[in-house]
């Protein structure tokens, strides 16, 4: 038993990550700008970027100045874009680390230019209503954009994974906004992972995948060759799995309760296994009495409330012993718990479930 697999651990398959990135790049047909914010979605930015570097992405996307500075400390030389609005007090650190900010209002664009300028990208709001210049009002920025032209411009699709008309609306709005710029920036980018899944080639200069890199989504349609013209469906490879070890097994009689609040009550004699992984390790509390884990390839229901350090499973009829592995995300034998399915059972988004893996559990990296 490895020391980092004694209690609870997250296994990160860097080989699967690289394959997902390769397929995303092939599908998009343009260089990638991978999103590695929030410690690479909870999976470890140093190892994730180390794996992605072998695929020569155009650059990386982060959420904060500190995240960008961390990439520079890791030796990353490529462009690093900060996708959340920054304040004037951040400008010195941004320049010190060679980062690229994004702006969507005249005041900050002028402040950036007057304080020394440098590369920046224009954020255009086409419906997310979170940040960026409203698409209808981009024309009002023509004067400042002429004096401080952006290196790039982008938008963000809010519902590309939904079967409605919002994606097409945002596409048209982005096209309209770009047409109002004094001239076309060198780089246009918009597609997140769900947007890339909707089409077989990027419309712009860069593609900006996030969660698809990490194995979450419906997969890609890969273009066929020019002769046959056949397309291939490519499902993402799972990248992350979450495991703990059984540390206690006991039998409960009819009517006995399990965990805080006594919300789980034994109906007949039941066998309960306690696993050394709780919500401080990434087993979300919302999975209490709803989720499952895999024990020796068999699904075992979570019994009662997930606690900070331990989770109890109903293993009645399952052959298991202390020291066996319980899997909360990932595969055992012929059974697999996918991130999207586990998130749905706990009323979570897959993104929320992923970033929760950056908590206490050890990370174990494999390349297969």
Enumerate the language-model features and the residues they cover.
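Active-site-proximal beta-alpha core segment in soluble small-molecule metabolic enzymes
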Residues: 2-4, 8-11, 15-19, 29-180, ...
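Active-site anion/phosphate-binding pocket segments in diverse small-molecule metabolic enzymes
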Residues: 1-21, 26, 31, 67, ...
């Amino acid at each position: 038993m490895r020391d980092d697999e004694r209690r609870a651990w997250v296994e990160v398959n860097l080989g699967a990550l690289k394959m997902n990135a390769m397929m995303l790049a092939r599908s998009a047909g343009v260089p990638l700008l991978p999103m590695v914010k929030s410690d690479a979605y909870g999976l470890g930015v140093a190892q994730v970027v180390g794996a992605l570097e072998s695929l020569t992405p155009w650059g990386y996307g982060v959420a904060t100045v500190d995240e960008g500075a961390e990439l520079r400390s890791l030796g990353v030389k490529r462009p690093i874009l900060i996708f959340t609005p920054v304040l004037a007090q951040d400008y010195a650190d941004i320049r010190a680390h060679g980062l690229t900010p994004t702006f969507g209002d005249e005041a900050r664009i002028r402040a950036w230019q007057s304080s020394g300028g440098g590369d920046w990208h224009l954020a255009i709001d086409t419906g997310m209503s979170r940040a960026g210049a409203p698409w209808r009002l981009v024309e009002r920025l023509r004067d400042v954009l002429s004096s401080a032209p952006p290196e790039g411009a982008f938008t963000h699709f809010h519902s590309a994974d939904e079967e409605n008309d919002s994606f097409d609306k945002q596409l048209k709005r982005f096209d309209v906004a770009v047409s109002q710029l004094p001239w076309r920036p060198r780089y246009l980018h918009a597609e997140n992972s769900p947007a890339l899944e909707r089409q077989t080639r990027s419309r712009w200069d860069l593609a900006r995948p996030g969660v698809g890199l990490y194995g979450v989504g419906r997969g890609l349609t890969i273009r066929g060759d020019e002769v046959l013209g056949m397309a291939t469906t490519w499902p993402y490879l799972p990248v992350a799995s979450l495991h703990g070890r059984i540390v206690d097994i006991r039998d409960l009689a009819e009517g006995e309760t399990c965990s805080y609040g006594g919300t789980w009550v034994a109906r007949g004699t039941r066998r309960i296994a306690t696993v050394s992984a709780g919500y401080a390790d990434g087993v979300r509390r919302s999975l209490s009495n709803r989720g499952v884990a895999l024990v020796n390839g068999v699904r075992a229901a979570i019994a009662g409330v997930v606690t900070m350090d331990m989770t109890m499973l109903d293993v009645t009829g399952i052959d298991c012993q202390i020291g066996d592995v319980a899997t909360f995300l990932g595969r055992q034998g012929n059974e697999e718990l996918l991130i999207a399915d586990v998130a749905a059972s706990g009323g979570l988004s897959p993104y929320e479930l992923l970033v929760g893996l950056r908590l206490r559990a050890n990370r174990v990296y494999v390349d297969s």
